[in-house]
Regions:
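Short, hydrophobic beta-strand segments that form beta-sheet elements in well-ordered domains
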Residues: 1-6, 36, 58-60
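Short alpha-helical segment that forms part of, or immediately flanks, the ligand-binding pocket
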Residues: 27, 46-54, 67
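Acidic donor-binding loop of glycosyltransferase active sites
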Residues: 31-43, 56
Length: 132
């Protein structure tokens, strides 16, 4: 597992810590990993989103919208470490891993791809034009 940004002292020997880096470098570094784990405080949900971009299954809590949307088979309830461990072990099964990987890629394309974003912004701009 890796961490970026702020590392807690008790994590020193548990995780490989990556120094802060620009997003362009980060997204390339992330692509080298097989599974994402985000069992900490939920924030903007970008880690879950970035994992999905690469087709990397992410085990995380259900209090992140991007997690619930993009990784339905690897989402656990807040604090459910037992289920998170079971999912981590299940991801060792190639068929389950591939199912999760393909599903998150598909969901990313449907919900968060550049095409979806551009259409969303276009709709907003058109609705603003209609109100003026």
């Amino acid at each position: 597992a890796i961490t970026t940004g702020r590392m807690k002292p008790e994590e020193k020997d548990l995780f490989k810590h990556l120094d802060w880096m620009y997003w362009g470098e980060w997204i390339n570094v992330l692509s080298q990993y097989h599974v994402g784990v985000q069992l900490g405080t939920a924030a903007a949900g970008t880690f879950n989103l970035n994992c999905s971009f690469h087709g990397i299954p992410c085990i995380a809590y259900s209090n992140s919208n991007t997690q619930k949307t993009l990784h339905p088979n690897t989402t656990v309830e807040l604090g459910d470490i037992v289920r998170a461990k079971k999912i981590a072990n299940r991801l060792k099964d190639e068929d389950f891993y591939n199912k999760c990987s393909q599903e998150t890629k598909r969901l990313f394309e449907e919900k968060y791809s550049e095409r979806v974003f551009v259409n969303h912004v276009k709709n907003i701009m058109e609705s603003l034009d209609e109100t003026n």
